Amino acid sequence: MNPILINRLQRKLGYTFQQYELLLQALTHRSASSKHNERLEFLGDSILSFVIANALYDRFPKVDEGDMSRMRATLVRGNTLAEIAREFELGECLRLGPGELKSGGFRRESILADTVEALIGGIFLDSDILNIERLILNWYQTRLDEISPGDKQKDPKTRLQEFLQGRHLPLPTYLVVQVRGEAHDQEFTIHCQVSGFSESVIGTGSSRRKAEQAAAEQALKKLELE
């Protein structure tokens, strides 16, 4: 690994690993080594959910669990994590196998998001829960300050459906047009057809559901421009 890139990443994270092997493992995709980051990702996913849930509980004492769940989902979903990964310039530090490198895996949102969760798991094991909580809240400070309960926290498919129903238009249709990758690391491409659109909008994701949500998000953006 390029030490300049690793040092830059740790500065952006706000944390220097004591156990360097944990950092390397967190950055290692399944395609690159048998000692990959998926166990750390599993751990980091749970820690992130706890930290964000706790922060929302403290910030919104009068908001019900439904709105808090939707706000948490917005904050921990894949594209939000991928945005954070890009803020860290994480793609340049990933350890990928030749196939993933060739297909542009360092830009793929699902890989970037999973690696952020793996880093959370790695930092927790390298330090403690208070330290990783402090870091997560720092990474999320602006997003936590800006988020609020309400309809905009509903997932894109729900918002698109309600938008169309409110105008007495047909519901959108979703079609899987491509599935790439091996069973453990697939990427789905979905076409979403909306009444009034001359062409389908496209969404991609690591599962059919995520790809459909991404396509619905693109449809909503297009509707807002019309």
Curated annotation (Swiss-Prot):
GO terms for cellular component: cytoplasm. SUPFAM superfamilies: dsRNA-binding domain-like, RNase III domain-like. Mg(2+) binds at residues 41, 114, 117. Its cofactor is Mg(2+). Residues 155-225 form the DRBM domain. It is an enzyme of class 3 (hydrolase). Residues 6-128 form the RNase III domain. It holds the Pfam family Ribonucleas_3_3. Coiled coil: none annotated. Signal peptide: none annotated. Keywords: Cytoplasm, Endonuclease, Hydrolase, Magnesium, Metal-binding, mRNA processing, Nuclease, RNA-binding, rRNA processing, rRNA-binding, tRNA processing. It is found in: Cytoplasm. Homodimer. Digests double-stranded RNA. Involved in the processing of primary rRNA transcript to yield the immediate precursors to the large and small rRNAs (23S and 16S). Processes some mRNAs, and tRNAs when they are encoded in the rRNA operon. Processes pre-crRNA and tracrRNA of type II CRISPR loci if present in the organism. This is Ribonuclease 3. It comes from Pectobacterium atrosepticum (strain SCRI 1043 / ATCC BAA-672) (Erwinia carotovora subsp. atroseptica). The lineage of its organism: Bacteria, Pseudomonadati, Pseudomonadota, Gammaproteobacteria, Enterobacterales. The gene is rnc.
